[in-house]
Each structure stands twice: as C-alpha cells, then as structure tokens.
Amino acid sequence: MSDSIKRVVLAYSGGLDTSVILKWLQVTYGCEVVTFTADLGQGEELEPARAKAELMGIKPEHIYIDDLREEFVRDFVFPMMRANARYEGDYLLGTSIARPLISKRLVEIARETGADAVAHGATGKGNDQVRFELSAYALNPDIKVIAPWREWDLTSRTALIAWAEQHQIPVPKDKRGESPFSTDANLLHTSSEGKVLEDPWEETPDYVYSRTVNPEDAPDTPEYITIDFERGDGVALNGQAMSPATLLAALNDLGRKHGIGRLDLVENRFVGMKSRGMYETPGGEIYARAHRGIESITLDRGAAHLKDELMPKYAELIYNGFWFAPEREMLQAAIDHSQANVTGTVRLKLYKGNASVVGRKSPFSLYSERHVTFEDDAGAYDQKDAAGFIRLNALRLKLLARQGR
C-alpha cells in the first residue's frame, strides 16, 4: 500500500485480533513486522505470543516481550496515585494509565529497529486509539501510526475469523463464538466492556468478575493491614519493604480475597459517546484509600483542597491520552511538591468489599490532639478568638441581607 513503510512495530498480544493485524500488515503493506508484547502484570503466560509470532514468520530478534511491571507502577501508577486521580470521581484509570507506557516502548523499539511506523489494535470507536497515538506523536512527531480497524473492511468477528482461516492463522476453538464481553487487564485493574454489559439497566452477571470474590462471599472476619508511605509513595506492607510492583500485587491478593474494588460505571468517552464498563481494581482501591488517609494528617488544608480542585483536570488528561502533554507535567510537578511530607503509616480494615482507614500516623503529622480535645487544652486555643473570626466572615453576608439579597 505504501512504498515508504518497510518495517512496522506492532503492539501484539498473540490473540486473534492482533494476529490478524500482523498478517494484514504483511499482506497489505508488504512490510516486515516487529512484534512487541508488554508484560504489565496482566496475569497471562506471554511465551505463546512469541511462539505464534515465530509461526507467522517473525524473526526471533524481532520479537520483543518486555517485563514492564516495575516501570508501570513506579513511573505511571504511583505518580497518578499521588494525585488521588479518579476520572469522573470514580474510575481509577487502570486502562488509561497503561497506554502511554506501551506507546513509549513502541516508539523506542521503532527507533532501535529502524522501523518506519508503529501499529495498534484499538478500534475506531474507543479511547485507546487516541491514547496510543497522542502518546506516540508526543514522543516522535514524525512517527507513522497504522490503525487497521480504521482501514480494513473486517467489520465483525465472523469476518475476522474467516480472514484468519483464509490466511492460515490458527483460530482457537473458544474464539469461534462471540465472546459475551471484552476484557483488558494489567497489574492495576481488569476492565470488562461490551455485549452482555451494554444495557446499563442490567446488573453485571457474576461470571464477568474474574479478579475479586463476591463481597457477600468474602471472609466473615475483617483483616487489618498497614501500608507505609514515603514522600507520597507506598514502600511497605505490614512492615515489610516492597518494590512498587510487588506491593501492588500483594494488595491485589488482599483485595481479591475481600471482594474490594468492584465498580460498575457509565462513563463519558473522549470520542463523544457514553460507555458502560465494569472495573475491578482490588489493590488500587486499597492503595488509593490509604494514600488519602496519610494525606489527611500530613497535608495543610490549603494544599489538600487545591489538590482536590486540580484532580479532575489531571484525571481527565490521563483519560484523554495527554500523559506526555506539558499541562499534565505541570500539574505533576505541583502534585509531587505537595508530597514532600506525605510520609507515615496507615492502618486499614478490609471487610466484605470495603477498605476503611482506621488509623494513621506520621512524623510530619499536622494533627494536634491538644488543640482539638474536648477536655481542658491548657490554654492551647482560646475559644473567644472564634467570635472575631465569625464576625469578619459574616460581614458580607450581613450587608447582602440588609440589601434584601
């Protein structure tokens, strides 16, 4: 199709869709394909992707399977969590935050292998196409991006399978029928969308949940844990130091056991439509609650409230694919500055779908028991001072009232 494209780096999972894309690139563009498979903690065995790529003629040296779990949590998830980011107040951005890292590595591999373009398997209806491509262009403005779902005429699962069989691409038997929903997973979350979930009135069937037990079936006894923070990032669980990815994985196990982190959500996509998704973020939900807990005693009121005002914009930037944009980096600098004293320990109670902060302590705590006590404060606070404070703040309200407004 294009003489200018000789080699393409494909974000490759080894599944049916990206295997069809791999062959389609070879047939349509007549180009060499380099495959890249990211291990983001999705819990799948990734070596079959290597075997399948080799079966489809990819040179061993052009098959990249990279373990990005630590980088993902350290450089993407934790910075986002410092902001307490939740898109539209609920969504912990598990899919959104993974895309810039995948794009970053795609662009790096393209540079390493001398590729002319990168390709992804995101559809033309969703947000991921935007996230992949905005990130790629931010890192390399001259990169070419191929989005097969916007180019080919394969408009159904049946057509995809027929094309695969025509080109001798192995089709697993469980892929011949329509899947009742589609999923995306990484160390932070699992998302499920489509088919059985498209009616927002219908409750999500139990079989959709893969990462958490039903809260009703969770243990009848609560479990208490502690998370240690240093400068806004988690560093230990129950007193045991852990790397970022190891900590999140351990929290995932706890969250799964106690049915924590389920979210049934109708959200506003960047491309303009509403979509219904079911998210499971067990460890991320625990971590987010804990981070809020340690901030509650270490952040000044003004800083805390300003962070809360900035958070929706920060979350929207990530959701819409602007991780590498200057405005996100500006907000990140402010957020990171706020975390200088966000150090200490949070105790949480895990019980039947809930992660409740029940204790917090910090060497930088701004909480003064002496000032808030209901007992004798030994002169720490003169309650008579409140009268002047109220009088000044009431002045404008009195003036408005006297004008009948």
From Swiss-Prot:
Pathway of action: Amino-acid biosynthesis; L-arginine biosynthesis; L-arginine from L-ornithine and carbamoyl phosphate: step 2/3
Catalytic activity: L-citrulline + L-aspartate + ATP = 2-(N(omega)-L-arginino)succinate + AMP + diphosphate + H(+)
Binding-site positions, L-citrulline: 91, 96, 127, 131, 182, 191, 267, 279
GO molecular function, a single term: ATP binding
Residues given in the record as L-aspartate binding sites: 123, 127-128
Signal sequence range: none
Top EC class for this record: ligase
Keyword set includes Amino-acid biosynthesis: yes
Alphabetically ordered keywords of this record: Amino-acid biosynthesis, Arginine biosynthesis, ATP-binding, Cytoplasm, Ligase, Nucleotide-binding
Enzyme nomenclature, EC number: 6.3.4.5
InterPro entries: Arginosuc_syn_C, Arginosuc_syn_N, Arginosuc_synth, Arginosuc_synth_CS, Arginosuc_synth_type_1_subfam, AS_cat/multimer_dom_body, Rossmann-like_a/b/a_fold
Superkingdom as given in the UniProt entry: Bacteria
Binding site for ATP: 11-19, 38, 121
Compartment(s) of residence: Cytoplasm
Primary location: cytoplasm
Subunit annotation: Homotetramer.
Homology family: Belongs to the argininosuccinate synthase family. Type 1 subfamily.
Protein name listed in UniProt: Argininosuccinate synthase
Source species: Sphingopyxis alaskensis (strain DSM 13593 / LMG 18877 / RB2256) (Sphingomonas alaskensis)
Gene: argG
